[in-house]
Structure formats: C-alpha cells, structure tokens
Swiss-Prot record:
<dbReference type="GO" id="GO:0046872">
    <property type="term" value="F:metal ion binding"/>
</dbReference>
<dbReference type="GO" id="GO:0005737">
    <property type="term" value="C:cytoplasm"/>
</dbReference>
<dbReference type="InterPro" id="IPR019772">
    <property type="entry name" value="Ferrochelatase_AS"/>
</dbReference>
<dbReference type="InterPro" id="IPR033644">
    <property type="entry name" value="Ferrochelatase_C"/>
</dbReference>
<comment type="pathway">
    <text>Porphyrin-containing compound metabolism; protoheme biosynthesis; protoheme from protoporphyrin-IX: step 1/1.</text>
</comment>
<keyword id="KW-0408">Iron</keyword>
<keyword id="KW-0350">Heme biosynthesis</keyword>
<feature type="binding site">
    <location>
        <position position="277"/>
    </location>
    <ligand>
        <name>Fe cation</name>
    </ligand>
</feature>
<comment type="similarity">
    <text>Belongs to the ferrochelatase family.</text>
</comment>
<keyword id="KW-0479">Metal-binding</keyword>
<dbReference type="GO" id="GO:0004325">
    <property type="term" value="F:ferrochelatase activity"/>
</dbReference>
<dbReference type="InterPro" id="IPR033659">
    <property type="entry name" value="Ferrochelatase_N"/>
</dbReference>
<protein>
    <recommendedName>
        <fullName>Ferrochelatase</fullName>
        <ecNumber>4.98.1.1</ecNumber>
    </recommendedName>
</protein>
<keyword id="KW-0456">Lyase</keyword>
<dbReference type="InterPro" id="IPR001015">
    <property type="entry name" value="Ferrochelatase"/>
</dbReference>
<keyword id="KW-0963">Cytoplasm</keyword>
<comment type="function">
    <text>Catalyzes the ferrous insertion into protoporphyrin IX.</text>
</comment>
Amino acid sequence: MSKSGVLLLNLGGPETQADVQPFLYNLFADPELIRLPFPFLQRAFAWAISTLRAEKSRRNYAAIGGGSPLRRITAEQARELQAHLVAEGYDVPVYVAMRYWHPLIESVVQQIKSDGITRLVVLPLYPQYSISTTGSSFKLLDRLWAEDPELACIERRQICSWYDQPQYVQAMARAIREQLDGFAEPEGVHVLFSAHGIPESYVTEAGDPYQREMEACVRLIWKQVGRPNDHTLSYQSRVGSVRWLQPYTERVILELGSRGVKQLLVVPISFVSEHIETLQEIDIEYRELAHRAGIADFRRVPALNADPLFIAGLAALVRPHLLTPGLAAPAFVPAAVGSSLLER
C-alpha cells in the first residue's frame, strides 16, 4: 500500500546545559559547515572548538531560559502543518528531524521506514538554500539512502529552497508592517534584515546560491511591505577569523547609530523559528549594542513560528508532491544510488 509522509528538517539545538557541548561537537564535526583543508582533523577540531566554546554558549542559553526552544516550535509547526493537510484531505504524517541534535535525522528516517512510508516529501525549514544547511542535510539523506536498501525503495521528493513562496513572503511582509505601525514615527524607522552568515568562500568558490537567494527574498518581501522606509541587508553569527558575507550586522548597527538613526526594526530573515540567534544574539547582544550606539528604540520582528499564513505556505509547498487522496500511487523505480528529485 502506498503512503506519503512529510519530513521537516531543521538545525536542532541543546535543550539543557548538559546538551551544549555535544551539540556544538556535532555542529563543528560537519565538514559542510566547517571546511578544513585536512578532513582527518575534523573530529579533533570539533572536540577542541566545542570544548572551548561550551562555557560561553551555556551562558547564552542560560540567558534565554536554559536551552533552545527550536524542537518545541518545530514540533508545533509539524502539528499545524499536518492538521492543515488533513483538512485538505491529505491524511499524512509529518515528521521532525534535526541535523545536529535530537531527534536526529538518522533515527527519524528509521521511524519513517518502520511506518511504511513509500513517498517522502522533504522540506527543510530554511527558506534560502545553502550548502551548509539544506545541502548538508540532503547529503546525509543521500548517504543513508545509499546504505540501506529498504530506504532506497522510498521515493524522496526534496524541496531545495522556497524563499519566493507567496504566503511566506506575505506573512513576513505583514509581520514587518505590524511592527512598523507600533513605532512613534513609523516612517522614520530603519529596517534591518539580518540573515545568518556563511563564509564568503562558499559563494565565491563553491557556488553557493545563498547570498543571491537572500537578496532576492528581501526584494520580494520589501515589495509586499510597500513602505518608503530605508532598509538594509546584513549578516550575523560569524564564527572564526575567515571572511564571511558582509556587511556584518553589528557593524551596520554601529554605522546606523553614527548616522543618527533612532528607531531600528530588525527582521530575522533566515530564521522561521525563535532560537538562540533571535532570542539571545539579536534581542540581547544587538539590542545592547544599538542602545550604546544611540539608537533609542530597538525592536525585532518575531519569527513566524506557527503563523497560520506561513503554515498554509508550507502546505502549498508539499501538496503537489503528495499522493492524491483516493488514488493509487504511480509506479516508482528507485533512482540511482545517491540521487534524489530536487524541486524549486
């Protein structure tokens, strides 16, 4: 019997203080995220850097309640998406898997196999594609499918990026307008789109489309916002000494303060769920930086989380790939090892 399922992918995050160091190890052990000239050093590097950064990272998580809310929020997104699909006649399970913390992709795909899924629609919760996020997860799925003949019989439909999905764009624009309208002088607010950064070499040497898609995404959203405010795109969360995509968010904040900007609205453009980068880096670090720079009114657009319009957009992304209710599945011949169907 044919059976569709949906798999939501995200980064993952530590839920307790004890989780922090092993989570960081998993993160830095991924060669798609941190590229070393000598791959055999990856694990030693991951152990060293996770050990060195663990204490500071624990303090950051303590500042937002002790751990990441990402798993809880992603589970809520999955429940709402499943309910939306059921209401449309698609009675399909929606699974959640994380790249670097529990529930890990490796364990969730075993559950998918046990549940008898024959077609799996994979939707990374990263609107813009990067080899370090969506690409890393797809590469892991390719390896798991190649190693397990039973998994290889499950058809995989993978959605690469969806920064231009209409309901996502509309939901972001609406959230920005709502926040702008709360300022004393809405027309004088500078809007700062802050995206998670990646090393510049990923774009210039590896051909990563992330920067191009991010810039296009901001243009689409801003057109929907329909306001005359000045706006800027910047990149946050830089790690290490290598050059990352610029301008850096912290430098833009300082520059805006020096130019006399007094009202600033930050839009976390690459984050669809609240987590450490929004709750601690933006809400605490960047807020303090802005106030020191003379920006009196600093606000942030909330992440979309389980916003109904956003969930409707996710449903629109996966719906074309689900088996039509009441109809038998079309014949499927497993693809060559490591291949997958990629959709835009």
